[in-house]
UniProtKB/Swiss-Prot annotation:
Residues 279-299 form a propeptide. Residues 1-20 form the signal peptide. Residues 177-198 have a biased composition (Low complexity). Predominantly expressed in the adult thyroid gland. Low levels also found in fetal adrenal and thyroid glands. One of its GO terms (molecular function) is glial cell-derived neurotrophic factor receptor activity. Receptor for persephin (PSPN), a growth factor that exhibits neurotrophic activity on mesencephalic dopaminergic and motor neurons. Acts by binding to its coreceptor, GFRA4, leading to autophosphorylation and activation of the RET receptor. May be important in C-cell development and, in the postnatal development of the adrenal medulla. This is GDNF family receptor alpha-4. GO terms for cellular component: external side of plasma membrane; extracellular region; plasma membrane; receptor complex. Interacts with ARTN ligand and RET: forms a 2:2:2 ternary complex composed of ARTN ligand, GFRA3 and RET receptor. Interacts with SORL1. It holds the Pfam family GDNF. Keywords: Cell membrane, Glycoprotein, GPI-anchor, Lipoprotein, Membrane, Receptor, Secreted, Signal. One of its GO terms (biological process) is nervous system development. A lipid is attached at G278 (GPI-anchor amidated glycine).
Length: 299
């Protein structure tokens, strides 16, 4: 099955659809990435590692994850975020989006059933890449271990409900984007420290008919640490900020991303179109709803 699907998925990722006349913003995002030399080069690299080699009967998981991290760390942020958050209405589009976020080679494990969420969590605590924000965040408090979302103090709930202790602004100066007619991309979207794509705890869309995300794990075999496991998994599955981020992109492209994609402000040459609701998004803080999926420059 992998041998048959690998080349097809590779073509889907690289070429998108032949036409985006129907308003498919995932296709528009793919075409925008293809038109950008750096985005296309980095995207081709991770597609070759994650899908090309998997089609030959193997899954170089470490290389796939490394290429995926490089794509999101070095690619133009507006283009990479557009690929991640584009809304989908059909299974083909949704599967392309899933494979863009975390290809199967880097997401699911070798077995048919997902492991306990404690396994990737423990692995992440030992991984240099996965715990990249530990130094900036101070002592790591176990991802809110022992505190279910319903029992956390109000002060904790008021903070960005992303990966507590991991998702923090970078201490480094964020990269500057090309000047455009609108406001610049906010600093925390450009240069965050957080859980990157291509790690053991990176979430993905759980199916092709919704915008829900979750890591490849469950809590069925977590024993007496079931509460810890559910609290960790809930950071992805019960995250109102994350849900709001996806809904915001479904309503229309945020202006800060449109400015990056079309710096000349010429609608005739813009690869992405924004709906009339996009102006309303200009008055919202998109960063307050991007805590989990903001991706850092690690390499």
């Amino acid at each position: 099955m992998v041998r048959c699907l690998g080349p097809a998925l590779l073509l889907l990722l690289l070429l998108g659809s032949a036409s985006s006349v129907g308003g498919n913003r995932c296709v528009d995002a793919a075409e925008a990435c293809t038109a950008d030399a750096r985005c296309q080069r980095l995207r081709s690299e991770y597609v070759a590692q994650c899908l090309g080699r998997a089609a030959q009967g193997g899954c170089p998981r470490a290389r796939c994850r490394r290429a995926l991290r490089r794509f999101f760390a070095r690619g133009p942020p507006a283009l990479t975020h557009a690929l991640l958050f584009c809304p989908c209405a059909g299974p083909a589009c949704a599967e392309r989006r899933r494979q863009t976020f975390v290809p199967s080679c880097a997401f699911s494990g070798p077995g048919p059933a997902p492991p306990s969420c404690l396994e990737p969590l423990n692995f992440c605590e030992r991984s240099r890449v996965c715990r990249c924000a530990r130094a900036a965040a101070g002592p790591w408090r176990g991802w809110g271990r022992g505190l279910s979302p319903a029992h956390r103090p109000p002060a904790a709930q008021a903070s960005p409900p992303g990966l507590s202790g991991l998702v923090h602004p970078s201490a480094q100066r964020p990269r500057r984007l090309p000047a455009g007619p609108g406001r610049p991309l906010p600093a925390r979207l450009r240069g965050p420290r957080g859980v990157p794509a291509g790690t053991a705890v990176t979430p993905n869309y759980v199916d092709n008919v919704s915008a829900r995300v979750a890591p490849w794990c469950d809590c069925g075999a977590s024993g007496n640490r079931r509460e810890d496991c559910e609290a960790f998994r809930g950071l992805f599955t019960r995250n109102r900020c994350l849900d709001g981020a996806i809904q915001a992109f479904a309503s229309g492209w945020p202006p800060v991303l449109l400015d990056q994609l079309n710096p000349q402000g010429d609608p005739e040459h813009s690869l992405l179109q924004v709906s009339s609701t996009g102006r309303a998004l200009e008055r919202r803080s998109l960063l307050s709803i991007l805590p989990v999926l903001a991706l850092p420059a690690l390499l």
